[in-house]
């Protein structure tokens, strides 16, 4: 999981 600001991207 990558957290960027208010964005959460699950890889």
UniProtKB/Swiss-Prot annotation:
Other comment: On the 2D-gel the determined pI of this unknown protein is: 5.5, its MW is: 48 kDa.
Top-level division of the source organism's lineage: Eukaryota
UniProt name for this protein: Unknown protein from 2D-PAGE of fibroblasts
